């Protein structure tokens, strides 16, 4: 299937599925123009840019009993946030911010208001099952991302379309154009895999990962992704792991280092960033040496590697929950009868990373709709606190301002500040004391539009 045909088919599927699901699930508001991107890094599709929906007209004033300052990692009391259109126009103490007489006031004086959460590693598409149409696959993806939005994740980085070609690009664009509700997305398209055994899926499905065999076609694969509109280049320097009889873990390495270096160099030449799926071993080492911008998973990351990542300015995205239970326990039980377990190794690595000064540790769930259901990603914050020893405030920073910075969106999201998008969430308690408050979301606003308000009667919230 040609790239053009693939894009046309994906766009048709997204359009049909989006129209159907939006009609069924949401009553939308009429819309208008968008705003240009002013940040660094991959070009996002913030919108709407001529789409159908927009936030309510006039000024919105949010009274916050407690407001989380994600820059400083602390709570501020009795704050007011003024919003016009999609943007925040003023933030400050209630005694200092004058609320216009005609403003619509949202009273969250008994709640904690935070920036919208950012999930740095999602898969909106499930792997397609035999006989599943692209339209059905797209419907499921839209349902997934809307569950994420209602759970408070107003932005996300989608790390490959799970054998659905570049349909994630079309969904990202549909969201930015206001045609469907969903988080602000950066996407990675098909992903690039090493030819040979790891490319068998592509032989069965031409929309699966794009296989490469040498440095030249590696560079061409990066260019194809950029031409199709991918924001990130998803690479797979490492594959599965297995325990030897001695208890030592062995990891599959895929691309030779020169090919991996060509992939990353071409990505950077085109002003994009690379995300590398590695579980450990030589592939993990190569990803760091080659300068992969974000290292995903890395079960046995060690201090020497973490220190090198700090020097190179790389970020670590463990996807803690997704790769522990049930994945690791199931894998290790089948392979060793539970004699050897990866979970303690992974927990040690994440705790070490969290304690490494200067290392940017991201909050990315790895949610895939199969082993980890969409809408449940707030569990990732809890595990960082309870298993990796992060303070709740630092975990909140990882899932907001740090993720925004790594994604190049630091001027637009990740903090409640003047000029940024009005992406806000609210919970009843104090998540800096009890991080599980994020699992009981009450209010979600994206770009000044109220997505969820569980404080209201169901009939009122639906209007």
Task: Give the ranges of each region predicted by the language model.
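Histidine-rich, glycine-flanked metal-binding segment
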Residues: 42-58, 67, 72-114
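C-terminal cap of metal-dependent C-N hydrolases
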Residues: 65, 399-401, 418-461
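Metal-associated gating/positioning segment near the N- to mid-region
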Residues: 108-177, 195-196, 202-203, 258, ...
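Active-site mouth loops of central-metabolism enzymes
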Residues: 127-139, 201-220, 273-275
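Histidine/acidic-residue-rich catalytic or RNA/ligand-binding cores of hydrolases
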Residues: 128-131, 168-169, 244-246, 284-290, ...
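Divalent metal-dependent hydrolysis catalytic cores, especially in the metallo-beta-lactamase
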Residues: 142-167, 182-190, 230-241, 273, ...
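Histidine/acidic residue-rich metal-binding segments in metalloenzymes
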Residues: 170, 216-236, 242-316, 342-361
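His/Asp/Glu-enriched, well-ordered alpha-helical/loop segment
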Residues: 269-271, 344-431
